Amino acid sequence: MPKINKYTDISEIDREAKKDYIDRHSPFITCANTATANEPFEVTVTMGNEYTHPDDFDHYIESITLFDGETKLAQATYIPGTLGNIKAHNTTKFTIIPTGKKLKLVAHGYCTKHGIWESTAVEVEVN
């Protein structure tokens, strides 16, 4: 089983290089706090908040996966050069249809050099 790296609040870290490493590999979820059952709901996942990630042929974000708890909802895959071979924030918009009473959204980003990185969970109330 591969190791899953988890986001650490970079404001609590002293070394700039470590802040950069953690932030640029971490997925960040942006969405509304509430959703309507059986209606489209948009979720944006951005790799990195303050720092950008490389897009080199051997070091890039290969995929971003969105989960509701342990249920895989969606996945986007990328090839090297998708972001023009420059450092950037890989941003993916997913549209899902919530059916339960609550969502517990978690995203995974996969870096070809540094493995799987997991976001902080985001809870969404479904009406």
Question: How would you describe each model-predicted region?
Answer:
Residues Y110-T120:
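Short acidic/polar inter-strand loop motif in beta-rich domains
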Residues P40, G100-V106:
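Extracellular Ig-like/FN3 beta-sandwich strand-entry sites
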Residues L73-G84:
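Solvent-exposed serine/threonine-rich low-complexity stretches and specific carbohydrate-binding patches
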